[in-house]
Amino acid sequence: MSNAASPATSAAPVRHYPMSCRTLATQEQIWSATAKCAKQIAEDYKQYNLSDENPLYLLCVLKGSFMFTADLARFLCDEGVPVRIEFICASSYGTDVKTSGEVRLLLDVRDPVENRHLLIVEDIVDSAITLEYLKRFLQAKQPASLKTVVLLDKPSGRKVTLSVDYPVITIPHAFVIGYGMDFAEAYRELRDVCVLKKEYYEKPASKL
């Protein structure tokens, strides 16, 4: 699936955040795009005869994708897709705005996933270094299938060749926060996806 939406322009409640210079996607626009993506996933996975005994495993990549995973799970439920949720954590970022290029696995899935249908759920893909690492790591566990769904795709930032199976929204190059995504662990609680003002990530994290 490559027909990701661009940031929507439909009417939605206007929320203002002092650390944001603009909003890329409101909570309501995210929900609309995620619901559409869930319908496509449900259609594509019919071939696997999913059931409570053969569910779709959503692998929530912590920390940033926790809100997206929760909403996606509910929209998949609306489409009749049985899911299980597992958590995994790997990062090529520290508290800076640039990737280090070195991926560290911080948390592995707890359940055995051999012969299971796995869907990696990411908040954002920029360089794709972390997602490429996770795909290789999880493929070694011999799942029945392995695909990726990403809320925000930034193709212009790629440092490795990688295509996302289900990109929900395509965004331009920008440092974004909100809807689970952070800068130095701040701003995850914002309802919308916003662009962080430059002066915020140029100041020490202790001053946030």
UniProtKB/Swiss-Prot annotation:
The cofactor remark states: Binds 2 magnesium ions per subunit. The magnesium ions are essentially bound to the substrate and have few direct interactions with the protein.
- Name it: Hypoxanthine-guanine phosphoribosyltransferase
Q: Which organism is it from?
A: Crithidia fasciculata
Cellular component terms (Gene Ontology): cytosol
Keyword Transferase on this protein?
yes
**Which EC number applies?**
2.4.2.8
Look up the record and name the cofactor or cofactors this protein needs.
Mg(2+)
**Which keywords has UniProt assigned to this entry?**
Cytoplasm, Glycosyltransferase, Magnesium, Metal-binding, Nucleotide-binding, Purine salvage, Transferase
Top-level EC class, please?
transferase
Q: What subcellular locations does the record give?
A: Cytoplasm
Catalytic residues (UniProt):
D126
